[in-house]
Amino acid sequence: MQGRVAGSCAPLGLLLVCLHLPGLFARSIGVVEEKVSQNLGTNLPQLGQPSSTGPSNSEHPQPALDPRSNDLARVPLKLSVPASDGFPPAGGSAVQRWPPSWGLPAMDSWPPEDPWQMMAAAAEDRLGEALPEELSYLSSAAALAPGSGPLPGESSPDATGLSPKASLLHQDSESRRLPRSNSLGAGGKILSQRPPWSLIHRVLPDHPWGTLNPSVSWGGGGPGTGWGTRPMPHPEGIWGINNQPPGTSWGNINRYPGGSWGNINRYPGGSWGNINRYPGGSWGNIHLYPGINNPFPPGVLRPPGSSWNIPAGFPNPPSPRLQWG
């Protein structure tokens, strides 16, 4: 039992040691960093850094300065020097004692002109060159019309306080715009004053969508037809009929109306499948002349020739023309 307890306590001890090792390492690293920072604080006056003279500084060493703080101190110095007009920055007197080689040059060496105005003039010049010809000549024609003064938005170089260099750049940009406006002349004024919508209304007055004839439908042959339709020459005919006269049956090839379906006789009124040249013959009759009696007895029903269901004792008609009519 004791061996088992000792074996189970060994991994727990290892876990505790592993958990305490990072804390020990962190403490040792922190002590080393503190010593290094103290050494740097005592050695800073030897590197040329300004320090307040007196025996009290050696007794009470100043806290160490991180090298990153030097870079951060340089950035506000660079940003605050152009914005400040001779006023000391908020960093104090220690910031003013930086060597001039590390920061910007002194204020006396700056040019007398304002750099922001020069940059604005250069940007205006580039914008004038990048404009398309259509927009540039319209704006210049309106701005440089003969007998018209300067625009209210513009001002002279003397009023804005521009330097001679900036005024020369402004005059150069204006001279570049002059030939474009002079080449157009009065046409540029007309186009700038009147938009192209007036031309559209002149071409198609009172028709905003370009409808030339609203009474006629799109693609129609007449005002009463449907979309893209043509009037039929024979509206009474049936679909697929080749016959000219109306009222004939479907697929009839006879020249005369009223014939039976599939009849190949030239005269109407013949029975179905009759091959005789004259109408009124009996069904299946192969005689050339009509009116010949049938060989069947009188009581038998006769096929279609003159009639179908003929009762017994009914006299046979003498002529087929009377029955056909």
Curated annotation (Swiss-Prot):
<feature type="compositionally biased region" description="Polar residues">
    <location>
        <begin position="41"/>
        <end position="60"/>
    </location>
</feature>
<feature type="compositionally biased region" description="Low complexity">
    <location>
        <begin position="147"/>
        <end position="157"/>
    </location>
</feature>
<dbReference type="InterPro" id="IPR026135">
    <property type="entry name" value="C6orf15"/>
</dbReference>
<dbReference type="GO" id="GO:0005576">
    <property type="term" value="C:extracellular region"/>
</dbReference>
<feature type="region of interest" description="Disordered">
    <location>
        <begin position="147"/>
        <end position="189"/>
    </location>
</feature>
<protein>
    <recommendedName>
        <fullName>Uncharacterized protein C6orf15</fullName>
    </recommendedName>
</protein>
<dbReference type="Pfam" id="PF15809">
    <property type="entry name" value="STG"/>
</dbReference>
<keyword id="KW-0732">Signal</keyword>
<feature type="region of interest" description="Disordered">
    <location>
        <begin position="41"/>
        <end position="110"/>
    </location>
</feature>
<feature type="signal peptide">
    <location>
        <begin position="1"/>
        <end position="26"/>
    </location>
</feature>
<dbReference type="GO" id="GO:0031012">
    <property type="term" value="C:extracellular matrix"/>
</dbReference>
<dbReference type="GO" id="GO:0030198">
    <property type="term" value="P:extracellular matrix organization"/>
</dbReference>
<keyword id="KW-0272">Extracellular matrix</keyword>
<comment type="subunit">
    <text>Binds to numerous extracellular matrix proteins.</text>
</comment>
<keyword id="KW-0964">Secreted</keyword>
